[in-house]
Amino acid sequence: MSELEQLRQEAEQLRNQIQDARKACNDATLVQITSNMDSVGRIQMRTRRTLRGHLAKIYAMHWGYDSRLLVSASQDGKLIIWDSYTTNKMHAIPLRSSWVMTCAYAPSGNYVACGGLDNICSIYNLKTREGNVRVSRELPGHTGYLSCCRFLDDSQIVTSSGDTTCALWDIETAQQTTTFTGHSGDVMSLSLSPDMRTFVSGACDASSKLWDIRDGMCRQSFTGHVSDINAVSFFPNGYAFATGSDDATCRLFDLRADQELLLYSHDNIICGITSVAFSKSGRLLLAGYDDFNCNVWDTLKGDRAGVLAGHDNRVSCLGVTDDGMAVATGSWDSFLRIWN
């Protein structure tokens, strides 16, 4: 037997031992524990606003922390800052590259960021003295497309990329301060924990990983999906997270139990998931699908509680406001819808 084959067998045995240890700790299922709880009932949401202005597919959106303004990125080469109450466009920012895949709003409301097939994370200052929006920093360094970005504050941002890495950047110096390596496929999505000390990533190696922002180490790895993970989102208390995959399932993983708690799927759903987000309490999990719908799941019981139907093409992105009062969905039909 070759040395490589021997090592492979040892690794397989170790993995089985870890899985057995996890199973030994798993003395009950989430469905059993929540069996006495009331169901959330039928969730019906209506479209309250439709944001029209993009001329091509919308690829990404992100709410500002005021729960009123949001940023969206489209294949039309524009980044638009919207007032969701009035549907007015506060800013329409022309991008140097129209192949944008992600956008983010800084917690302060002073900056937005975007990136995509240009491999660069571009930071835009919304609060310039002249009143015009301009690029304040460009962060080159990834060797693959930029799939997701999220601000820690006005001076730091975390990015994920098709080069299989994530990175923490010092925006002022435009330097990567930490690189997070460990995935063996394109990293598609990231989600910051509520305390901003860790983040979780989902990738095309069908695994999700928990990273410590301070030292760059991978703290935990989670498997279970059988296809690319397109979206991840932290549970509001920071102790769990959800994933959405091309295998047509969403899954809930618990950090303390170190394993999957629940799978969200339906026989009628055979298409991939593009985006996931929790309600403010965490009781509902919203997921955007390739079949033009957004499904609402009862997080604790695993039942489908509702459907947001209205888009005429793939739902590519969604987000819940910080105050929990509204959901925004963005679609390849070029429209954003605000629901509650």
Swiss-Prot record:
<dbReference type="InterPro" id="IPR016346">
    <property type="entry name" value="Guanine_nucleotide-bd_bsu"/>
</dbReference>
<dbReference type="InterPro" id="IPR036322">
    <property type="entry name" value="WD40_repeat_dom_sf"/>
</dbReference>
<keyword id="KW-0144">Charcot-Marie-Tooth disease</keyword>
<comment type="subunit">
    <text>G proteins are composed of 3 units, alpha, beta and gamma.</text>
</comment>
<dbReference type="GO" id="GO:0044877">
    <property type="term" value="F:protein-containing complex binding"/>
</dbReference>
<keyword id="KW-0853">WD repeat</keyword>
<dbReference type="GO" id="GO:0005829">
    <property type="term" value="C:cytosol"/>
</dbReference>
<feature type="repeat" description="WD 1">
    <location>
        <begin position="53"/>
        <end position="92"/>
    </location>
</feature>
<dbReference type="InterPro" id="IPR001632">
    <property type="entry name" value="Gprotein_B"/>
</dbReference>
<dbReference type="InterPro" id="IPR015943">
    <property type="entry name" value="WD40/YVTN_repeat-like_dom_sf"/>
</dbReference>
<feature type="modified residue" description="N-acetylserine">
    <location>
        <position position="2"/>
    </location>
</feature>
<dbReference type="GO" id="GO:0045202">
    <property type="term" value="C:synapse"/>
</dbReference>
<feature type="modified residue" description="Phosphohistidine">
    <location>
        <position position="266"/>
    </location>
</feature>
<dbReference type="InterPro" id="IPR019775">
    <property type="entry name" value="WD40_repeat_CS"/>
</dbReference>
<feature type="repeat" description="WD 5">
    <location>
        <begin position="224"/>
        <end position="263"/>
    </location>
</feature>
<feature type="repeat" description="WD 2">
    <location>
        <begin position="95"/>
        <end position="134"/>
    </location>
</feature>
<comment type="function">
    <text>Guanine nucleotide-binding proteins (G proteins) are involved as a modulator or transducer in various transmembrane signaling systems. The beta and gamma chains are required for the GTPase activity, for replacement of GDP by GTP, and for G protein-effector interaction.</text>
</comment>
<keyword id="KW-0807">Transducer</keyword>
<dbReference type="InterPro" id="IPR001680">
    <property type="entry name" value="WD40_rpt"/>
</dbReference>
<feature type="repeat" description="WD 6">
    <location>
        <begin position="268"/>
        <end position="307"/>
    </location>
</feature>
<keyword id="KW-0007">Acetylation</keyword>
<keyword id="KW-0225">Disease variant</keyword>
<feature type="repeat" description="WD 3">
    <location>
        <begin position="141"/>
        <end position="179"/>
    </location>
</feature>
<keyword id="KW-0677">Repeat</keyword>
<feature type="repeat" description="WD 7">
    <location>
        <begin position="310"/>
        <end position="339"/>
    </location>
</feature>
<dbReference type="Pfam" id="PF25391">
    <property type="entry name" value="WD40_Gbeta"/>
</dbReference>
<dbReference type="GO" id="GO:0021762">
    <property type="term" value="P:substantia nigra development"/>
</dbReference>
<feature type="repeat" description="WD 4">
    <location>
        <begin position="182"/>
        <end position="221"/>
    </location>
</feature>
<dbReference type="GO" id="GO:0070062">
    <property type="term" value="C:extracellular exosome"/>
</dbReference>
<dbReference type="GO" id="GO:0005765">
    <property type="term" value="C:lysosomal membrane"/>
</dbReference>
<feature type="modified residue" description="Phosphoserine">
    <location>
        <position position="2"/>
    </location>
</feature>
<dbReference type="GO" id="GO:0005834">
    <property type="term" value="C:heterotrimeric G-protein complex"/>
</dbReference>
<keyword id="KW-0597">Phosphoprotein</keyword>
<dbReference type="InterPro" id="IPR020472">
    <property type="entry name" value="G-protein_beta_WD-40_rep"/>
</dbReference>
<keyword id="KW-0523">Neurodegeneration</keyword>
<dbReference type="GO" id="GO:0005737">
    <property type="term" value="C:cytoplasm"/>
</dbReference>
<dbReference type="GO" id="GO:0030159">
    <property type="term" value="F:signaling receptor complex adaptor activity"/>
</dbReference>
<protein>
    <recommendedName>
        <fullName>Guanine nucleotide-binding protein subunit beta-4</fullName>
    </recommendedName>
</protein>
<comment type="similarity">
    <text>Belongs to the WD repeat G protein beta family.</text>
</comment>
<dbReference type="GO" id="GO:0007186">
    <property type="term" value="P:G protein-coupled receptor signaling pathway"/>
</dbReference>
<keyword id="KW-0622">Neuropathy</keyword>
